[in-house]
């Protein structure tokens, strides 16, 4: 996965793909048109952040382009960029708010007959992340991309990842 913050980065997808056989995931924030550019250039998966991708019409454009090329979309919910007011609506329950955010965006993509979806629920708080993934696994029938966000230094990241992946049921 690599960040695609601008047009130049999106234009580089084809060149990068020609130099590797590893599947590439474009991490898109704010500008849905960058996702469209990456899809046109053969990206293997697009990751969008429901908290900052823009309106429903933007999601529709990305869903239609991805569907035409059978490219999955990862809905990447990040605790730090939940939709305004969602955490309050969920009574301050962060894992519940994260799953609610994913649910909203799954429903949007499903309205456009798109269901080639992978979900992630990331927080820098390992306990909240584990709870969000457990709730997501009970709520959705989509693959889950596991991970933490803002993991910190290499050592901190290893510890947080180990805690996430070995958390008892």
Language model segments and positions:
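N-terminal active-site wall of soluble small-molecule enzyme domains
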Residues: 3-41
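Hydrophobic faces of well-ordered beta-strands that scaffold small-molecule active sites
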Residues: 1-2, 24-26, 46-48, 73, ...
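Glycine-enriched alpha-helix->loop->beta-strand junction motifs that scaffold or abut catalytic
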Residues: 20-22, 40-46, 67-69, 138-142
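Structured alpha-helical segments in the cores of large, soluble enzyme domains
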Residues: 35, 62, 95-110, 129-138, ...
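Glycine-rich, proline-tolerant flexible connector loops at the mouths of alpha/beta enzymes
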Residues: 1-15, 50-53, 117-120
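Conserved anion-binding
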Residues: 54-112
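Active-site glycine- and acidic-residue-rich loops that bind
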Residues: 50-57, 120-130, 153-159
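Conserved small/polar residues in nucleotide/adenosyl-binding loops
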Residues: 165-169
């Amino acid at each position: 996965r690599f960040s695609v913050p601008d047009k130049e980065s999106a234009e580089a997808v084809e060149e990068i793909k020609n130099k590797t056989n590893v599947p590439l995931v474009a991490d898109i924030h704010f500008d849905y048109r960058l996702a469209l550019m990456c899809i046109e250039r053969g990206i293997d998966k697009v990751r969008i952040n429901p908290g900052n991708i823009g309106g429903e019409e933007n999601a529709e454009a990305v869903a239609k382009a991805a569907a035409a090329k059978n490219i999955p979309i990862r809905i990447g919910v990040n605790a730090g960029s939940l939709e305004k007011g969602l955490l309050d609506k969920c009574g301050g329950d962060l894992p519940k708010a994260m799953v609610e955010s994913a649910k909203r965006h799954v429903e949007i993509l499903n309205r456009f007959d798109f269901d080639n979806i992978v979900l992630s629920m990331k927080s820098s708080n390992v306990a909240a992340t584990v709870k969000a993934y457990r709730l997501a696994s009970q709520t959705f029938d989509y693959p889950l991309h596991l991970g933490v966000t803002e993991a910190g230094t290499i050592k901190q990241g290893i510890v947080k990842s180990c805690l996430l992946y070995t958390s008892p049921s």
